[in-house]
């Protein structure tokens, strides 16, 4: 794969400084860039690295345009990181081999399934009765599409994705390998020392432009649907419980978990390994630090953390022991304050 700078500029815009005929064969970081690499600088504190890099071209903000031009070609744009993201999409699209349209002979597709224009169904995939696939949908090998599932146009499923009945995907979604959407939520009623299963009768609704990482699971609702808003980004190995609602353009890092019936607002982020307990509500613009456990609803936007800092084991044990005695220490402090007050 290679492209001249003028091709990048024509596709993505920005102000091009330097030789437009330079050939780019790689996108890479400043430190490992060579004379055929395009890189980017998103912050002025990396000015020194900009001067030292061997990159053929660097994407920079206007504040670094002069520095970049002194060392070689540059593309100047208000938001270099966003430009870099768009560049990776453009580059990947040129690298990607379009799958053949049509249904592979080894796939099993029910007679009443509706396939849009240009749909591709890979080997050993099963699509059950009543499913609807929009134009340009790509289903890779060994996927399972349950009865009545709806998949919006231009959505892509990697191998081994499972969509259970009652699942509706929006347009332009990307589901990575091993994703399971619409399995039963965890619902059981205790009765005389045993557990009685509560059948999960809802579905899962996923909005447009959602990306779901490998081996992430989203459970179907108990009665109402589980809802994933448009533009949501979910990393690998995330568990979303039944009846959860995640607002548009929120993002969650790997190994996070959201228990049943929790509601997460728009534009929220949840760090890796963080847990949101069931039936809680996070307002729009709430950001949860990695490994935190959210045990109460959060009504105001902002950054929230609930992580016990790491330490050597001996110190940690002492601090943990102190924490267990906080209520006693509080009572002793109150007693001392009363004695010392006039």
Swiss-Prot record:
<comment type="subunit">
    <text>Homotrimer.</text>
</comment>
<comment type="pathway">
    <text>Bacterial outer membrane biogenesis; LPS lipid A biosynthesis.</text>
</comment>
<keyword id="KW-0012">Acyltransferase</keyword>
<keyword id="KW-0444">Lipid biosynthesis</keyword>
<keyword id="KW-0677">Repeat</keyword>
<comment type="function">
    <text>Catalyzes the N-acylation of UDP-3-O-acylglucosamine using 3-hydroxyacyl-ACP as the acyl donor. Is involved in the biosynthesis of lipid A, a phosphorylated glycolipid that anchors the lipopolysaccharide to the outer membrane of the cell.</text>
</comment>
<keyword id="KW-0808">Transferase</keyword>
<dbReference type="GO" id="GO:0016020">
    <property type="term" value="C:membrane"/>
</dbReference>
<keyword id="KW-0443">Lipid metabolism</keyword>
<dbReference type="InterPro" id="IPR001451">
    <property type="entry name" value="Hexapep"/>
</dbReference>
<dbReference type="InterPro" id="IPR007691">
    <property type="entry name" value="LpxD"/>
</dbReference>
<dbReference type="GO" id="GO:0016410">
    <property type="term" value="F:N-acyltransferase activity"/>
</dbReference>
<comment type="similarity">
    <text>Belongs to the transferase hexapeptide repeat family. LpxD subfamily.</text>
</comment>
<feature type="active site" description="Proton acceptor">
    <location>
        <position position="242"/>
    </location>
</feature>
<dbReference type="Pfam" id="PF00132">
    <property type="entry name" value="Hexapep"/>
</dbReference>
<dbReference type="InterPro" id="IPR020573">
    <property type="entry name" value="UDP_GlcNAc_AcTrfase_non-rep"/>
</dbReference>
<dbReference type="Pfam" id="PF04613">
    <property type="entry name" value="LpxD"/>
</dbReference>
<dbReference type="InterPro" id="IPR018357">
    <property type="entry name" value="Hexapep_transf_CS"/>
</dbReference>
<dbReference type="GO" id="GO:0009245">
    <property type="term" value="P:lipid A biosynthetic process"/>
</dbReference>
<dbReference type="InterPro" id="IPR011004">
    <property type="entry name" value="Trimer_LpxA-like_sf"/>
</dbReference>
<protein>
    <recommendedName>
        <fullName>UDP-3-O-acylglucosamine N-acyltransferase</fullName>
        <ecNumber>2.3.1.191</ecNumber>
    </recommendedName>
</protein>
<keyword id="KW-0441">Lipid A biosynthesis</keyword>
């Amino acid at each position: 794969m290679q492209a001249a700078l003028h091709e990048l500029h024509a596709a993505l815009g920005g102000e091009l400084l330097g030789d437009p005929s330079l050939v780019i064969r790689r996108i890479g970081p400043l430190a490992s860039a060579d004379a055929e690499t395009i890189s980017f600088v998103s912050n002025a504190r990396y000015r020194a690295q900009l001067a030292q890099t061997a990159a053929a071209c660097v994407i920079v903000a206007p504040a670094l345009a002069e520095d970049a031009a002194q060392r070689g070609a540059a593309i100047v744009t208000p938001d270099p990181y966003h430009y870099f993201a768009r560049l990776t999409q453009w580059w990947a699209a040129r690298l990607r081999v379009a799958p053949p349209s049509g249904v592979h002979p080894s796939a099993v597709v029910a007679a009443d399934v509706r396939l849009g224009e240009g749909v591709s169904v890979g080997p050993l995939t099963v699509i059950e009765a009543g499913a609807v696939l929009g134009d340009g949908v790509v289903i890779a090998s060994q996927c399972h599409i349950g009865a009545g599932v709806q998949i919006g146009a231009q959505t892509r499923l990697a191998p081994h994705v499972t969509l259970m009945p009652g699942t509706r995907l929006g347009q332009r979604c990307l589901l990575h390998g091993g994703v399971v959407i619409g399995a039963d939520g965890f619902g059981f009623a205790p009765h005389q020392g045993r557990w009685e299963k509560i059948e999960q009768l809802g579905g899962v609704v996923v909005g447009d432009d959602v990306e779901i990482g490998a081996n992430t699971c989203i459970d179907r609702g108990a009665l109402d649907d589980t809802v994933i808003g448009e533009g949501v980004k979910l990393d690998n190995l995330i568990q979303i419980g039944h009846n959860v609602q995640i607002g548009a353009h929120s993002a969650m890092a790997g190994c996070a978990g959201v228990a049943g019936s929790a509601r997460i607002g728009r534009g929220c982020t949840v760090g890796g390994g963080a847990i949101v307990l069931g039936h809680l509500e996070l307002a729009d613009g709430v950001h949860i630090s990695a490994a935190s456990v959210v045990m109460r609803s959060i009504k105001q936007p902002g950054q929230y953390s609930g992580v016990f800092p790491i330490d050597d084991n001996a110190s940690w044990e002492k601090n943990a022991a102190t924490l267990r005695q906080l209520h006693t220490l509080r009572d002793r402090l109150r007693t001392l304050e009363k004695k010392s007050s006039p």
